[in-house]
């Protein structure tokens, strides 16, 4: 699998031993592209859209990754049991063509290296493969945005968000959507609004990890961050994260054509040593 380095959107790196800030502001910088990932083409097929694209229309079973090109500290030391808290947000879209059945989805990933160990297409989401799926030595954390139900991987439906640790099978998953609070005073209540991830619209995701708790919040791009997360999961990632890791994105499709685009991205890792 080829590794491409490409000047892309400005991810500004402010780095100390205990803090990292990445900001993507649609200008210039360097990412690492693996597989079919690229700076995506615009609808005219000639110019570039300004988005990171994980898959290519012309390649059946296309899959790829785009990662930050330098290692980011996720723990104070290799044997630390206290990973740094982190938060990331990004805007994405998934666009499909109906025939054949589209799939499969994209994911925010944190991986131990940029040397890919043969990630697979389709349900493996460009992260895992048949051989390494489920291996605790993978040291991979991911949040998937899955638009194809693969019952063999335990998918709850064809439109869900899940947290994955070393496996394409999610440890927790919820149908895609967001929470809205309505009413006044004591009459306030939460209502859930479901939406289709693969309708081509842009959505924004917020992922946070602190005190062994992962929260995932999702909403349409034009909606402010909901106060109630879509997913709250108590997970100890101290055995998953190595001292240095590479954050980024992956995506994969099957026979059907599907675009997986990232339009903006911020990442912050800021923590005191414990």
Curated annotation (Swiss-Prot):
InterPro entries: ConA-like_dom_sf, L-lectin, Legume_lectin_dom, Leguminous_Lectin
Subcellular location: Secreted, Extracellular space, Apoplast; Cell membrane
Family annotation (Pfam families): Lectin_legB
SUPFAM superfamilies recorded: Concanavalin A-like lectins/glucanases
Main subcellular location of this protein, as a coarse class: secreted
GO molecular function: carbohydrate binding; kinase activity
Gene3D superfamilies, alphabetized: 2.60.120.200
GO BP terms, alphabetized: cellular response to salicylic acid stimulus; response to bacterium; systemic acquired resistance
Protein family: Belongs to the leguminous lectin family.
The protein's role, per its UniProt record: Plays a positive role in the effector-triggered immunity (ETI) response. Involved in salicylic acid (SA)-mediated processes occurring in ETI response, but is not involved in the autophagy process. Promotes systemic rather than local immunity. Essential for systemic acquired resistance (SAR), but not necessary for immune signaling downstream of SA. May act in parallel with SA.
Record-given protein name: Lectin-like protein
Gene that specifies this protein: LLP
